Amino acid sequence: MVARPEPEVEAMDAELAVPPPGCSHLGSFKVDNWKQNLRAIYQCFVWSGTAEARKRKAKSCVCHVCGIHLNRLHSCLYCVFFGCFTKKHIHDHAKSKRHNLAIDLMYGGIYCFLCQDYIYDKDIEIIAKEEQRKAWKMQGVGEKFSTWEPTKRELELLKHNPKRRKITSNCTIGLRGLINLGNTCFMNCIVQALTHTPLLRDFFLSDRHRCEMQSPSSCLVCEMSSLFQEFYSGHRSPHIPYKLLHLVWTHARHLAGYEQQDAHEFLIAALDVLHRHCKGDDNGKKANNPNHCNCIIDQIFTGGLQSDVTCQVCHGVSTTIDPFWDISLDLPGSSTPFWPLSPGSEGSVVNGESHASGTTTLTDCLRRFTRPEHLGSSAKIKCSGCHSYQESTKQLTMKKLPIVACFHLKRFEHSAKLRRKITTYVSFPLELDMTPFMASSKESRMNGQYQQPLDSLNNDNKYSLFAVVNHQGTLESGHYTSFIRQHKDQWFKCDDAIITKASIKDVLDSEGYLLFYHKQFLEYE
């Protein structure tokens, strides 16, 4: 279980604001009138604000090798050459002419062939943003998320073209692959889970974020807002999340670099940064409670974990409640002692999970997580009732459930003597009832004996699975993929840029590393 970190002080924000070193190969481009030349490229071939510019772009922006305008067309920054990125025509040009920089004509990103990656440069970013805003203004858009008000001509066109695009059960809008930027599968799978979180999607697509940062370009929430726009724009080509990666590196330095990272660690770091950057969206001050945060991250992901420590002499109970963003669960096969399955589990179905003999279930892991634990003589606490140090028991229960419950199955074991991955299969259900693990249900559980809730009509604590993150491989070398639910019974596998349809069986048979559940019914506060 990872508790939600407290907000960082401004001094740390200032420290993290220093970006990592950029591309060292930009020097050959930044000579003479490079800014003027770059602005001309953005105006004519990328943003194209006027109708004439868009026509010119459509006619002239074709690959100089195959004559096609698709396949992620890029333009050389040193000479007049357009080439396909997908078919490597721009790569061949870069190699033969030693022109190592090119610009993506769809999104405006700069690619370095020596770094073999999209790069970030503050000066170029400023020019790109300025030219983009100019193009929006020419088109009458103003701001990217401003309300659309149709002109008289557009109203006439709407009358003569009444057909609307309907979102059906077979619609694939929202499905989009992500380019792997070099061992970034850990990030891609979490992005897929977040972009398919229903309430988070609704928040960003309704333009609810109001940035109060001095530099919006360094705001991760602004970038997530743009990311949601990209995912639900209807485009099917893989998205390149280079800006997101740069911001994560900037604000979570321990994740910087192209080494393999942990998806769970990235999730917690991303939620932490999003939480800190959501200050402008937080109306918690209205509650006259300076410690209360009501940002979208806390509304969706934050739960309350109750810890009851009971003195074994006077049976006095000390209770604390801590916020959490996820629940980390031990697995059989780890160095942490596990308990055998209950005798009645064989051949039974509990919480929608099939309990075969020897099979560990998510419910089993939650039972272990919430069972009383004897702290032992080496961990005595000072009892306020006895006024002396006594042995005690500790029990964790759920005081408040989050809207989205994320369960982290602890498959990676790190210790002084051991580093390994635990591959124990854990059965998890499509629907999960958390009632047995609530603090309010504690009285009904005696000596570790758990029963299904008698009131089957209580839906407040019921969840539905909507995303699963998996890890294939070993601790030293592996790959992350994810399953996401597009509609109620439609599942897709996301493997970086590749999206394929999956069956429910594929999902439930997978190993499971991070399990994302969404509340079935939401209560108003």
From Swiss-Prot:
The catalytic activity of this protein is classed by the Enzyme Commission as: 3.4.19.12
Major enzyme class: hydrolase
- CDD domains the record matches: Peptidase_C19D
Main subcellular localisation: nucleus
Pfam families according to UniProt:
UCH, zf-UBP
User: The USP domain covers which part of the protein?
Assistant: 176-520
A single GO molecular function term of this UniProt record: zinc ion binding
Q: Which Gene Ontology BP annotations are present?
A: G2/M transition of mitotic cell cycle; positive regulation of DNA-templated transcription; positive regulation of mitotic cell cycle; positive regulation of type I interferon production; protein deubiquitination; regulation of DNA repair; regulation of RNA splicing; regulation of transcription by RNA polymerase II
The compartments listed are:
Nucleus; Cytoplasm
Residues that hold Zn(2+) 3 according to the record: 76, 79, 93, 99
Signal peptide range in chain numbering: none
Modification N6-acetyllysine, positions: 129
The residues that the entry says bind Zn(2+) 1 are 23, 25, 112, 115
Q: Name one GO cellular component term.
A: cytoplasm
InterPro entries listed in its UniProt record: Papain-like_cys_pep_sf (IPR038765), Peptidase_C19_UCH (IPR001394), Ub_carboxyl-term_hydrolase (IPR050185), USP_CS (IPR018200), USP_dom (IPR028889), Znf_RING/FYVE/PHD (IPR013083), Znf_UBP (IPR001607)
Q: What does this protein do?
A: Deubiquitinase that plays a role in several cellular processes including transcriptional regulation, cell cycle progression or innate immunity. As part of the transcription regulatory histone acetylation (HAT) complex SAGA, catalyzes the deubiquitination of both histones H2A and H2B, thereby acting as a transcriptional coactivator. Recruited to specific gene promoters by activators such as MYC, where it is required for transcription. Facilitates cell-cycle progression by stabilizing CCNB1 and antagonizing its proteasome-mediated degradation in a cell cycle-specific manner.
What's the name of the protein? Ubiquitin carboxyl-terminal hydrolase 22
Name of the gene encoding the protein in the UniProt record: Usp22
